Regions:
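Conserved catalytic network of the ASCE P-loop NTPase/AAA+ motor domain
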Residues: 61-63, 88-91, 109-113, 139-143, ...
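Conserved nucleotide-binding/hydrolysis micro-motifs of P-loop NTPases
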Residues: 75-78, 102-103, 123-126, 153-157, ...
Length: 265
């Protein structure tokens, strides 16, 4: 930090450095417009299925159902794929359930003419050997798959670092931050994302589909991460009524009332 800065200028300097190092996408072009195959990966309970449904709904509202494909690898757990199937039925998009690399290759071949394919993966603890198997399965297909890691904003910095390093495998294309509505602080998550040089695509702050997913707005995220809460003396805390201002533009959910009424853990 430069010497002889006033407190106000020092804070401004810190914000500018954080903004310079926090890599985010500016709009939906990199996902919904550009298209491709995207796999949402991460530990159990981080919100992968709901986030996949939110992205699917966001795509349908912008481009329609014809060129969207949905795949779930959660075929082993009893009822594991049913949640995404319900969303798929509402959206009018068939969900393909796969259980191994061979199934995945078949499903991708069937969907090869789709503009965008979203893959919801089974949740695996970062310390489970199945993580390596899952990454290998996603890496050994005939189509390039972009791997987006879902990070729980309520987790500690140590846990998030552990998750990222376990799932990195042959490389991550980016991440999404989930459960912002449950987090007392987002400083840990932002710190780890910056240190691990991950691109932050979206943030999710609730269970509603498709409303509760937003493009990450780095200026607001940093501003609120640096706030101190006088009542709790905790850094990086922001209030629930501030959440809408932390995010980028939300989608217009006027045509998704059916989805809005659905809520899953």
């Amino acid at each position: 930090m430069p010497d002889n800065l006033t407190e106000e200028k020092a804070v401004t300097w810190v914000k500018s450095i954080l903004a310079l190092n926090l890599n985010t996408i500016e709009n939906d072009t990199e996902v919904l417009d550009q298209g491709g195959v995207f796999a949402l990966i991460g530990p159990t309970g981080v919100g992968k299925t709901t986030t996949t449904a939110k992205l699917a709904a966001r795509y349908v509202m912008k481009h329609g159902t014809k060129n969207l494909g949905l795949i779930t690898t959660d075929a082993y757990r009893i009822g594991g794929h049913e949640q995404l199937r319900i969303y798929g039925k509402i959206l009018g998009v068939m969900v393909h359930a796969v259980k191994d690399e061979a199934d995945l290759k078949i499903a991708l071949n069937e969907l090869k003419n789709k503009h965008t394919i979203l893959i919801d993966t089974v949740g695996v603890s970062q310390r489970d050997r199945m993580v390596a198997e899952q990454i290998a399965m996603l890496s050994n297909t005939n189509m390039p798959i972009k791997k987006l890691l879902c990070l729980n904003a309520t987790s500690t910095g140590e846990t998030l670092t552990d998750v990222i390093r376990a799932y990195k495998g042959k490389g991550l294309d980016g991440c999404l931050m989930t459960k912002l509505d449950e987090a007392a602080t987002i400083g840990n998550a932002l710190d780890v994302i910056i240190k691990e040089k991950l691109k932050l695509y979206y943030v999710a702050n609730g269970q509603r589909v498709p409303e509760d997913i937003h493009l990450a707005n780095k200026q607001y995220l940093i501003q609120h991460a640096l706030k101190l809460s006088a009542s709790s003396n905790q850094s990086f805390q922001f209030l629930n009524d501030e959440l809408p201002f932390v995010m980028g533009d939300t989608v217009n959910a006027a045509n998704a009332s059916q989805l809005s009424g659905m809520s899953y853990a």
